[in-house]
Amino acid sequence: MESPRIHGGAEEKSSCESGWTMYIEDTFHGNHHSEVVYEEEDDGFSVKEVDDDGDGDEDDDDDDDDDSSNNESDDSMTSDASSWPSTHQPPRSTKNHAAAKNSNAKQVNNQTENRVRDRFSDEGEESELKARTRTTAASRVKVSKTK
């Protein structure tokens, strides 16, 4: 597809440039012949074409050809976003997902507590470990004070 625009002298054309790219660039740079205006109506939005002089008349010539394309908008370049449902519906299994998530969290907490309990199965071992730690720390303090 050949681009209708001319930028200065000769136009460089990329081999990967498509018709869509040229269409979008032409529209972006203001090289289009009409613009699309979305008007809000009671039942949603409608598309209205505005010509270059901005008066809203789509047909400037005086011929009376009855063409059905003048009455309908050209939606070929319109986004497919209108095909999605208008209301968002949450997944049906939201409650089940939340319950499973809570169950998994409780299971992880229980496993962690069990590991701690296994590590110190006897309260005597736990208190003995604390006493060793205190003794070692106190002896380090004494040694550093004597120097």
Swiss-Prot record:
Disruption phenotype: No obvious developmental defects. Plants missing both SOLF1 and SOLF2 have reduced endogenous cytokinin levels and accumulate lower levels of trans-zeatin riboside monophosphate (tZRMP) and N(6)-(Delta(2)-isopentenyl)adenosine monophosphate (iPRMP), biosynthetic intermediates of bioactive cytokinins as well as decreased response to exogenous cytokinin in both callus-formation and inhibition-of-hypocotyl-elongation assays. Residues 96-106 have a biased composition (Low complexity). A motif (SOFL-A) lies at residues 18-23. One of its GO terms (biological process) is cytokinin biosynthetic process. The keyword Cytoplasm applies. It is found in: Cytoplasm; Nucleus. Keywords: Cytokinin biosynthesis, Cytokinin signaling pathway, Cytoplasm, Nucleus. Residues 78-93 have a biased composition (Polar residues). The keyword Chloroplast does not apply. Residues 37-77 have a biased composition (Acidic residues). Residues 114-131 have a biased composition (Basic and acidic residues). InterPro entries: SOFL. Residues 32-147 are annotated as: Disordered. GO terms for cellular component: cytoplasm; nucleus. Predominantly expressed in the vascular tissues of seedlings, developing leaves, flowers and siliques, but barely detectable in roots and stems. A motif (SOFL-B) lies at residues 76-85. Domains SOFL-A and SOFL-B are required for function in cytokinin-mediated development. Involved in cytokinin-mediated development. Together with SOFL2, triggers the endogenous content of specific bioactive cytokinins derived from the biosynthetic intermediates trans-zeatin riboside monophosphate (tZRMP) and N(6)-(Delta(2)-isopentenyl)adenosine monophosphate (iPRMP) such as N-glucosides trans-zeatin 7-glucoside (tZ7G), cis-zeatin 7-glucoside (cZ7G) and N(6)-(Delta(2)-isopentenyl)adenine 7-glucoside (iP7G). Belongs to the SOFL plant protein family. This is Protein SOB FIVE-LIKE 2. The gene is SOFL2.
